[in-house]
Every structure is written in C-alpha cells, then in structure tokens.
Curated annotation (Swiss-Prot):
UniProt superkingdom: Bacteria
Pfam annotation, one family: Ppx-GppA
Protein name: Exopolyphosphatase 1
Region (Disordered): 315-339
UniProt keyword Hydrolase present: yes
A GO MF term: exopolyphosphatase activity
Catalyzed reactions: [phosphate](n) + H2O = [phosphate](n-1) + phosphate + H(+)
Family to which this protein belongs: Belongs to the GppA/Ppx family.
Organism in which the protein naturally occurs: Mycobacterium leprae (strain TN)
Length: 339
C-alpha cells in the first residue's frame, strides 16, 4: 500500500510518501518539505495569522496534489502543537478542509508521545528491553517509558525548542545569564515529570528522536545523514554540555554554518540543547541512542495495525492541572482493554 503522511509541525510541513504493509519495513519513496514556522505564526491573542493560514492552506493543497500524483491510496494528515494550541485552530482546520479537501487531524501531545514510542520500539525491537524515549519538537517535549509497543507512561510538556527560544532567549546570541536562568527553570519544570516517567521503571535503553536530537548528535560527532539511517548514532550528556558552551556564544547565522544544522533550526538549537541536557539530567541518562524513526513512522505503523485489528488510530488522553498531557494506562490497554 502506498501511503502519504502529511505532518504539519511547528517548524515545517512535511509530506512523506511510503510503500508499507503490516509486518514490513515502511519504504520511503519521496519526501517533500516546506518551512512555515507555524510556531512563530501567531498574533498577540494566540491566533494563527491570516498570512500564515494562507500559506498553510496553499502548501497543504500543493502537497495533496503531490500525494495524488505519487499514487498514494490514502493521505494521512496531522498537525501537532503549533496548530493544536492556536486560538483559532478550528477555523484554520475548517478552511484547510474546505479549500483543499484534506482533513487535518490534530494530535494530542500524548498521542505524539505514544506513536513515536511505537516507532522506536519497532526500530530497536524487543531485545532492547525497557525503553525511555525523548523527543523535542518546536512546541513541546515528549517523554515515554515502557516495555511493550504502548508505553506505560507518555507525557507531553510545553517545552519545545521554538517556544523556549521565543520566551527565554530572544537575543542573538543569547546572554549567559538568560541561558543559566533557562537551565534552572527547566530543572524545576522537569522535576515532577521525571519522577512520573521513572516510576514505570529504570530503562535498559535510552533513546532520542526528532530533528533537534539528530542535529545535536551530529554537532557532537555522530555520523552524517549520508551514512544512512542504520548508522549507529548517540549523544552523551557530557558532549552536550560542551556543545552548549560553544554554540550559546555564537549568533544564529554562525551556527547555521556548522555541519548538521540547518538555517531554519539554527536560531532554536541552543534552547533545544538546553532541553535535551535538562531532560537527560532529570532522568539520570548519560547517553541516548538516536532513532531515525519517529512520529510519522509511528503513525504509519499504527495505521496498518488499526486496519488489521480494528482498533482506533489514536485514543483519548487526559490533561493534568499543570497543563502537561499524561497517559499512564496505555500499556494496560494494549494488554487487553482495547475500548
């Protein structure tokens, strides 16, 4: 089956076309991206601007045509935190559907976390044992822990690299004092979340997904993307600390000259590095293995599974009083309760 996955993220809109069937390795056929920076496209009231909405609609329409011309039997389109948190998200979604015919599904943060965990589990396999996964997006940080394909704990926190750059590091380069303040604040924000994640059990393997982690690993010496997805890549907390000391003194334009970081992500890589470091510190992780699969692959795998066994593509989650999304019962559902 040829599938198209359209991902409206905080930084980019990405269309991935794959050939996939249940039990098989999804084979990428094409990849098309557009940088829209939706995480920065809101006005003072928290609504997506008309200009940004216009660009989003035209991009989705263009990508939908690419999916059709590529022979996709189905286009799965989803959006994450930038659209999810916008005050006018319903209006934007309605406009996308009306003008392009694409039904854009907004994923909850914990669904992002759970679907990404599924992709990680399939990539590393059962022999990896208990896995903790970390994923840094433009608007949120996802954490998960489990021994099955459904994590026992899945969290989504509003600690994305783009969000924190805007709120904490507006200067270029960021001042040393602001970096130190953000570091301390992250330690406080992650204290309760780390306890929740670790209550499920100590990991046998710590994994990281997302472009932010891949860029950080490359900046600390990991293999380039040209080496292929199966090249082993890792990121250490010591290497991360040294990297932060280096890149936090550079301007965004200078950081963009470094191998492994794009012009689009250069402004927010310092905040991303600080989130990565704080997360690893909070979870007592020294090294994370980088997984090339993440949310898009997880959605493809869940789609194939749901068609075979009749389960829902995504399930409901709860939001706690601190604004973080948390799911502590996913593994129990996967073991028998599929309602």
């Amino acid at each position: 089956m040829r599938l198209g996955v359209l991902d409206v993220g905080s930084n980019t809109v990405h269309l991935l076309v794959v050939d996939a069937y249940r039990g098989g390795h999804p084979t990428p056929m094409s990849s098309t991206k557009a940088t829209l920076r939706m995480v920065e496209a809101t006005d003072s009231s928290g609504k997506i601007t008309k200009r940004a909405a216009d660009k989003l609609v035209s991009t989705i329409g263009e990508f939908a045509k690419i999916a059709v011309s590529s022979g996709c039997a189905e286009l799965m389109a989803f959006a994450t935190s930038a659209v999810r948190e916008a005050g006018n998200s319903d209006d934007v979604l309605s406009r996308v559907r009306k003008e392009t015919g694409v039904r854009l599904q907004v994923l909850r943060g914990v669904d992002e976390s759970r679907l990404t965990f599924l992709a990680v589990r399939r990539w590393f396999g059962w022999s990896a044992g208990r896995i903790i996964n970390l994923d840094i997006g433009g608007g949120s940080l996802e954490l998960s822990n489990g021994v099955d394909e459904e994590p026992e704990v899945a969290l989504s926190l509003p600690l994305g690299a783009g969000r924190l750059t805007r709120e904490w590091l507006p200067d270029d380069p960021p001042g040393r004092r602001r970096v130190a303040m953000l570091r301390d604040w992250l330690d406080s924000e992650l204290s309760d979340a780390s306890v929740t994640v670790l209550e499920a059990g100590k990991p046998d393997l710590a994994v990281a997904t997302s472009k932010t982690f891949r860029s950080l690993a490359r900046l600390t010496g990991a293999a380039p993307s040209a080496a292929g997805p199966r090249a082993k890549r890792a990121l250490t907390v010591n290497g991360l600390r040294q990297l932060i000391a280096f890149i936090s003194r550079m301007t965004a334009s200078d950081r963009a000259e470094l191998e492994g970081i794009s012009t689009e992500r250069a402004p927010q890589i310092v905040a991303g590095a600080l989130v990565a470091e704080a997360s690893m510190r909070a979870l007592s992780i020294e090294t994370v293995d980088i997984c090339p699969w993440a949310l898009r692959e997880g959605l493809i795998l869940r789609k194939l599974d749901s068609e075979a066994d009749g389960t829902a593509l995504v399930q409901t989650s709860v939001r706690d009083t601190r604004g973080q999304e948390v799911d502590r019962n996913a593994a129990n559902r996967s073991r028998g309760d599929k309602t």
